[in-house]
Amino acid sequence: MNLIILNLYYLVILFSIIGYGYFLSNILKLYINVKEIVIFGILGIIFLTFISYLTNIFSPHGFVHNIIIHSIGIILFLSAVKSEVIIKKKIYVIAILSIIIVCFSLLSKTHDDFGWYHLPYTLNLSQNKFQYGLGHFNHGFRTPSSLFYLNSLFYLPGIKFYSFNFAQLYIFQFSLIYFYKKIFNKENNNSFEIFYSLLAFIFISVVFYRLAEHGTDRSGQTLLFIVIVLILNILSKNLVETKKINLIILLLVYLITIKTYFIIFILLMLPILMFIKKDYLIYKKIFFSKTIAFSILFLFLHFHIQLANSGCLLYP
């Protein structure tokens, strides 16, 4: 695969992801700061996965389908840039970092499970619409990850299945930028949050830098670090921010779709629940928000896929 073509596709899809993140933040009224382009990126990953779950019921994720999806994403991205929601200077920085990450990713092999079931499952999504009973063909098909569905949207002419690790790279990239900003943010006076972000940045850089380490678990663990930072931020400010709580809920839901065992980390919400205590107005704002409605629908689609593949709602 030509390196220039690979980088061009990576950048185009990256901008599409950010565009969808901007769109989702508006729908859910999350009011993301213009400086938080990384959050737009993470939200874009979540929304594109949701779209992938939904559209695969009716259609395979072939070239035409994916070109339409990313054309809309680019339009959304350009509208965000035009309205100055996204700062142009940050785009250049992310673009340069993207090229570096793509080049370095080629130095290592793919994950050991990639050829076993990651590639076949994702390729099947690109060639066929939703099917029941896939778990009978391959043991790995019984544990579908949302990352396979996200990667299936990157099946495009000229690159084909060479993009089937892009999802992991985007999560890796957004996480590094997120923690880097937390470490060097002059407005952040929380030393514990800065120290934790530094440890997370070093850990991800050292342990997860090779593509061979990125199956599905590593991406979930990376996002889990972000969830913990958001929780620390809420608790340290001694201020309930429903926007951040909604963001935490979205991330926890997405973690469950990556690997079902991440469901145990819902317990991380306990400190926030203890912090809110009996403030029923805040509970009402959270439980009757668009975020909860979106999350319920997202989980319904995920467990429907899980049931269709393995016959179990929770597997293994």
Annotate each PLM feature:
Residues 53-56, 208, 244-260, 264-271, ...:
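Membrane-interface alpha helices of multi-pass inner-membrane proteins
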Residues 102-193, 211-213:
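Active-site lumenal/periplasmic loops and adjacent helix-entry segments of GT-C-fold
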Residues 107-109, 150, 289-316:
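Membrane-lumen/periplasm interface segments of specific transmembrane helices
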